[in-house]
Amino acid sequence: MNRCWALFLSLCCYLRLVSAEGDPIPEELYEMLSDHSIRSFDDLQRLLHGDPGEEDGAELDLNMTRSHSGGELESLARGRRSLGSLTIAEPAMIAECKTRTEVFEISRRLIDRTNANFLVWPPCVEVQRCSGCCNNRNVQCRPTQVQLRPVQVRKIEIVRKKPIFKKATVTLEDHLACKCETVAAARPVTRSPGGSQEQRAKTPQTRVTIRTVRVRRPPKGKHRKFKHTHDKTALKETLGA
């Protein structure tokens, strides 16, 4: 009888595990995350109607059960080591959408696109850019306020093995404010089989008509009797007659 109950319980656990592995993440969860500001794991657990202390309490009860059941100092020491490992690991915090200092490389194309035989100093500077992740996959961290900041750099040219220093101005873009904004999804373009024909019908077509002009030749034999007449005076008299 006990063996049958054990098989039944193991089968139930297996079916539950299989169903849990194949379930996709529901869309309601994405909507729930997008409507709240979640900065830590505790906030996420509160949003999902959970208690932050349940996980730590379960681990503590498990360790205490093992220590009392064994009754040995070694098991108690293992429980203390497991609790110590939990206190060392700090909770993960979300990288919220805000401005951060980033390194921007000043390329030579920003100064002179026609010439590449020079150096730029400094080669890189610091800028403020928006970065971070949002709670929903349909939104992205984007700047809402931008400021243009001109800076002066040195353009170093080598002419006849001598360096020539020139000044150049580069405009940098700093982000002052950020916000998680909705990303417009690209609509799929559906092409019907008759779409190309309709487009051709709507497009005005210019027809070029080429007309061929034929030159009529005089009928043969009309002036055949004057073919061998070389005297112009005799030809005029004959035509005048």
Curated annotation (Swiss-Prot):
Where in the body, by tissue, does this protein show up?
Answer: Expressed at high levels in the heart, brain (sustantia nigra), placenta and fetal kidney. Expressed at moderate levels in the brain (hippocampus), skeletal muscle, kidney and lung.
Residues the record annotates as the site (Involved in receptor binding) are R108, I111
Q: Which UniProt keywords apply?
A: Chromosomal rearrangement, Cleavage on pair of basic residues, Developmental protein, Disease variant, Disulfide bond, Glycoprotein, Growth factor, Mitogen, Pharmaceutical, Proto-oncogene, Secreted, Signal
User: Where in this protein does the record put region Disordered?
Assistant: 216-241
State the organism named in the record.
Homo sapiens
Query: Where is the secretion signal located?
Result: 1-20
Q: Which family does it belong to?
A: Belongs to the PDGF/VEGF growth factor family.
The name of this protein is: Platelet-derived growth factor subunit B
Q: What does this protein do?
A: Growth factor that plays an essential role in the regulation of embryonic development, cell proliferation, cell migration, survival and chemotaxis. Potent mitogen for cells of mesenchymal origin. Required for normal proliferation and recruitment of pericytes and vascular smooth muscle cells in the central nervous system, skin, lung, heart and placenta. Required for normal blood vessel development, and for normal development of kidney glomeruli. Plays an important role in wound healing. Signaling is modulated by the formation of heterodimers with PDGFA.
Asked if the keyword Zinc belongs to this entry, the reply reads no
The record, for Pfam families, names: PDGF (PF00341), PDGF_N (PF04692)
Query: Which gene is annotated as encoding this protein in its UniProt record?
Result: PDGFB
Looking up InterPro entries in the UniProt record yields: Cystine-knot_cytokine, PD_growth_factor_CS, PDGF/VEGF_dom, PDGF_N
Q: Name one GO cellular component term.
A: Golgi lumen
- Basic residues bias located where? 216-230
Q: Which GO terms describe its biological process?
A: angiogenesis; cell chemotaxis; cellular response to growth factor stimulus; cellular response to mycophenolic acid; cellular response to platelet-derived growth factor stimulus; embryonic placenta development; gene expression; heart development
Molecular-function GO term, any one: protein heterodimerization activity
The disorder this protein is implicated in is: Basal ganglia calcification, idiopathic, 5: A form of basal ganglia calcification, an autosomal dominant condition characterized by symmetric calcification in the basal ganglia and other brain regions. Affected individuals can either be asymptomatic or show a wide spectrum of neuropsychiatric symptoms, including parkinsonism, dystonia, tremor, ataxia, dementia, psychosis, seizures, and chronic headache. Serum levels of calcium, phosphate, alkaline phosphatase and parathyroid hormone are normal.
